[in-house]
Amino acid sequence: MSSSWIVGLLAFLVSLVALTQGLPLLEDLDEKSVPDGRIVGGYATDIAQVPYQISLRYKGITTPENPFRHRCGGSIFNETTIVTAAHCVIGTVASQYKVVAGTNFQTGSDGVITNVKEIVMHEGYYSGAAYNNDIAILFVDPPLPLNNFTIKAIKLALEQPIEGTVSKVSGWGTTSPGGYSSNQLLAVDVPIVSNELCDQDYEDFGDETYRITSAMLCAGKRGVGGADACQGDSGGPLAVRDELYGVVSWGNSCALPNYPGVYANVAYLRPWIDAVLAGL
């Protein structure tokens, strides 16, 4: 058996893994859904309001004739570095992605398009708890032309947000469970929920692996619902005053009163991010 044939087979298997693990679906979790950044109860916004937001577009290895399609969101850290969710990129390779910045839409060729050259996924992803350490760093080339208007870097949080602080989540996707995705960039404002309360809310969700860890933070209108991130755009930003506090990760369905959205905790994961960047 030739080595080239083996490489081709491995690439095909990786592509299959990506379809099942890269974007978890409702049926994958026995009627437990994983928010991937779909905005529920939000409003149309302009990229100038969230200029750090990017569209991460994907194409399967076995379908090179297909166009790159929006898969996840992400945030610009600097001209060559994007922060996104680990579950967006697990089982895939860099050449399957392009990053589009400075656009209001998840389709089309407006905005600035660049290539993903390297993916660094947290080595502790899913260790100890479902979706634990759900973060990844993408390196792109050519560099993004930052302009402080539609393409702008965002600072990474160093401290935990205070409970009740209103945060902004942005992204593309459907506006209701099972609905159609939005081509227009959307945003929603949600208050931070303490990890203690969030863990109580998720106590009866799934098995014991679905718990809230220090590597996560929660946000949502607890007891009210109606506003949340959800399936369709994982990896997108949760920001407070133009500072990145969270990366859209998972949760139970969308905008339910007693199930806040769960995000990767940027402040807690900052040492890992800094170590990755220092290793360049």
From Swiss-Prot:
Enzyme superclass (EC): hydrolase
Domain Peptidase S1 stretches: 39-278
GO terms of molecular function: serine hydrolase activity; serine-type endopeptidase activity
Active-site residues, record numbering mapped to chain: H87 (charge relay system), D134 (charge relay system), S234 (charge relay system)
Any single GO CC term annotated in Swiss-Prot or TrEMBL for this entry: extracellular region
Site positions per UniProt: Required for specificity: D228
SUPFAM superfamilies named among the record's database cross-references: Trypsin-like serine proteases
Propeptide: 23-38
EC number: 3.4.21.4
Catalysed conversion reaction: Preferential cleavage: Arg-|-Xaa, Lys-|-Xaa
GO biological process: proteolysis
Xref: InterPro entries: Peptidase_S1 (IPR050430), Peptidase_S1_PA (IPR009003), Peptidase_S1_PA_chymotrypsin (IPR043504), Peptidase_S1A (IPR001314), Trypsin_dom (IPR001254), TRYPSIN_HIS (IPR018114), TRYPSIN_SER (IPR033116)
Cysteines paired by S-S bonds: C72-C88, C198-C218, C230-C254
CDD domains on file: Tryp_SPc
Entry keywords, A to Z: Disulfide bond, Hydrolase, Protease, Secreted, Serine protease, Signal, Zymogen
Region forming the signal peptide: 1-22
Pfam families tied to this protein: Trypsin
Subcellular location: Secreted, Extracellular space
PANTHER family, per database record: AT26814P-RELATED (PTHR24276:SF91), POLYSERASE-RELATED (PTHR24276)
Family: Belongs to the peptidase S1 family.
Name this polypeptide is given: Trypsin zeta
Annotated gene: zetaTry
